[in-house]
A protein has these predicted regions:
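Local sequence-structure signature of Cys/Sec-based thiol-disulfide redox active-site neighborhoods
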Residues: 1-28
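Conserved residues at beta->alpha junctions
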Residues: 7, 32, 58
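Short alpha-helical
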Residues: 11, 36, 62
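Alpha-helical elements of the RecA-like P-loop NTPase motor core of helicases
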Residues: 14, 18, 39, 69
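Residues at alpha-helix termini
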Residues: 23, 44-45, 74
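Thioredoxin-like thiol-disulfide oxidoreductase module
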Residues: 31-48
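Structural micro-motif
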Residues: 45-55, 64-65
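Non-catalytic, surface beta->alpha helical segment in thiol-disulfide oxidoreductase systems
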Residues: 56-78
């Protein structure tokens, strides 16, 4: 399964990456000011969005907490 992380390089972004790697996701990390701008991030996810933002497949899951809940609900932590 594939996942995309929109990252600004903070600890939660790194935690999301480690978590997804441990669950054998193929990960693409898009980095602020390298792959997208803050303005583009806000346009895509809204002004209240925090880093990281995670997409699993074609589904936008949300931040790290939402990603953990999504994975738990899908039984990925068994």
């Amino acid at each position: 399964m594939e996942a995309v992380i929109y990252s600004n390089g903070n600890q939660e972004c790194e935690r999301a990456k480690i978590l997804l790697e441990k669950l054998n996701f193929q990960i693409s990390v898009y980095k602020l000011n390298q792959h997208f701008s803050q303005k583009g991030f806000i346009a895509e996810f809204g002004e209240e969005a925090e880093y990281p933002q995670v997409n699993v497949g074609f589904k936008h899951v949300g931040g790290l907490k939402e990603t953990l809940k999504y994975m738990s609900d899908k039984g990925m932590f068994l």
